Design a protein with these regions (language model features):
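N-terminal glycine-rich, Lys/His-bearing helix-loop that initiates the first secondary-structure elements
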Residues: 1-60
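PLP-dependent enzyme catalytic core of the Aspartate aminotransferase-like
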Residues: 1-6, 128-129, 137, 155, ...
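Conserved PLP-enzyme active-site core in the AAT-like
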Residues: 7-11, 23-27, 89-319, 327
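Pocket-edge structural micro-motifs
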Residues: 22-24, 40-44, 67-69, 357, ...
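Short, acidic Gly/Pro/Ser/Thr-rich loop/turn segments
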Residues: 27, 45-49, 237-238, 299, ...
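Conserved N-terminal alpha-helix of the aminotransferase class I/II PLP-enzyme fold
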Residues: 48-97, 122-129
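Short hydrophobic/aromatic beta-strand micro-patches
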Residues: 231, 354-356, 416-418
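Conserved small-domain helix->loop->beta segment predominantly found in fold-type I
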Residues: 280-283, 287-289, 294, 298, ...
Length: 437
């Protein structure tokens, strides 16, 4: 007998191969198509009445309705879970939906969250204002002050929430230390890895329990598609924690199932799909899932170029007489930031960052208005270079004190460095500096 040939599923594939093949290791079984098909359907035919009853009764796994599952989305979920090193994933209609569902799956009325201050403005508003109306409060802390983080945890705290790279200044947090604090208090560490990407860092390997992404950013990569995804690390013991009855006790709206018992390591995303997505419906469309799969296929290639260009822009800005300060971990004056950057981002990172121009908000806006190659818009992580004035746009809903808490000044300019030729990027920046001298 010949030697057993391993299948793709049996092999330990590298990241660049995983991003191309997971979920569709073989061509489509019906059509032999190599590309993942777009299953543009709202619903699925049952073979007979018993088959329908078994699907609804959870005795037969499979598709029931497009709000909950879709074959195209399933492949995207399998692939991003593999890239992040998780056990399961759930794709949803936006990054905001991913964060909201994650918090709603952990915290109920009367509960509490501890969150880093340096987070996306939309998430800050969700935690500081919107969820308060539903009985969930948040304490915002300096994620670099570990004593402050631990001191903010209460008996009713249900999670510690951070971002891999802070928004908008790309500060690096100590994931391992924060995970240790969260686990000491029997709560999960939730991390937004949108800016980090699984190509540069896999937070689950450092102790994070749940990872969220705005897939709109690096995953999609081209500024065309809105979506989000939640990845379940599968390592948090919900039963041992004793703080999450919604995951461990029988659910009256779903056949009395205990998600921790029924879904095991994938309990967290399974409950979101079965309850929150079922009832509130922030579903990702199959076409968007297909576009995100296209994005994943080139993720490593694009991110390498993003990072390479960004580090050259940082070096350029550091030498500019009109620049007061560059906020990027690679040039931070804080030795702890330098240490964390080298530890968590050995291959570089932070293609979205800010700098402070000498002058006021008018000088910052004048500089932005003279840029030609950079697009002035609210997105980030596009292959095209982007720019915005956070104080008057993305963080305008925050008061001056809240902006200062997040490291945003009137003269702060946020850049998202694209994949254009670096000479063209630097030329555009230099032209704008020359125009506002």
């Amino acid at each position: 007998m010949g030697k057993h040939m391993s299948t793709l599923k049996e092999r330990k594939l590298k990241f660049e191969t995983l991003q191309l093949h997971v979920g569709q290791e073989e061509p489509d079984p019906v059509t032999d198509a190599r590309a993942v098909p777009i299953y543009q359907t709202s619903s699925y035919v049952f073979h007979n009445s018993k088959h329908a009853a078994d699907r609804f009764g959870l005795r037969d796994a499979g598709n029931i309705y497009g709000r909950l599952t879709n074959p195209t989305e399933d492949i995207f979920e399998q692939r991003i879970a593999a890239l992040e090193g998780g056990v399961a994933a759930l794709a949803v209609g936006s990054g905001a939906a991913a964060v909201t569902y994650t918090i709603e799956n952990l915290a109920q009325a009367g509960d509490h969250i501890v969150s880093a201050k340096n987070i996306y403005g939309g998430t800050y508003n969700l935690l500081a204002h919107t969820l308060v109306d539903f009985g969930v409060t948040t304490t915002f802390v300096d994620p670099f002050n570990l004593e402050e983080v631990e001191g903010a945890i209460k008996d009713n705290t249900k999670a510690v929430y951070i971002e891999t790279l802070g928004n908008p200044n790309s500060e690096v947090v100590d994931i391992e230390a924060l995970a240790e604090i969260a686990h000491k208090h029997k709560i999960p560490l939730v991390i937004d890895n949108t800016f980090g990407t699984p190509y540069l860092i896999r937070p689950i390997e450092y102790g994070a329990d749940i990872v969220v992404h705005s897939a709109t950013k690096f995953i999609g990569g081209h500024g065309t598609t809105i979506g989000g995804v939640i990845i379940d690390g599968g390592k948090f013991d919900w039963a041992a924690s004793g703080k999450f009855p919604q995951l461990t006790e029988p659910n009256p709206s779903y056949h009395g199932v205990s998600f921790a018992a029924a879904a095991g390591p994938a309990a967290f995303v399974t409950r979101i799909r079965a309850i929150l997505l079922r009832d509130t419906g922030a579903t990702l469309s199959p076409i968007h899932a297909f576009i995100f799969l296209q994005g994943l296929e080139t993720l490593s290639l694009r991110v390498e170029r993003h990072v390479d260009n960004a580090l050259k822009v940082v070096e350029f800005l550091e030498k500019q007489p009109l620049v007061e300060k560059v906020n990027h971990p690679s040039v931070s004056e804080d030795p702890e930031q330098q240490r964390l950057y080298k530890k968590y981002f050995p291959n570089g990172g932070g293609s979205i960052f800010t700098f402070e121009i000498k002058g006021d908000d008018k000088k910052a806006q004048e500089f932005i208005d003279h840029l030609q190659l950079f697009s002035l818009l609210a997105n980030v992580a596009d292959v095209k270079s982007l720019v915005i004035h956070p104080a008057s746009t993305t963080h305008a809903e925050l008061n001056e004190a809240e902006q200062a808490e997040q490291g945003i000044k009137p003269n702060t300019i946020r850049l998202s460095i694209g994949t254009e030729n670096i000479d063209d990027i630097l030329y555009d920046l230099q032209e704008a500096f020359d125009a506002v001298k």
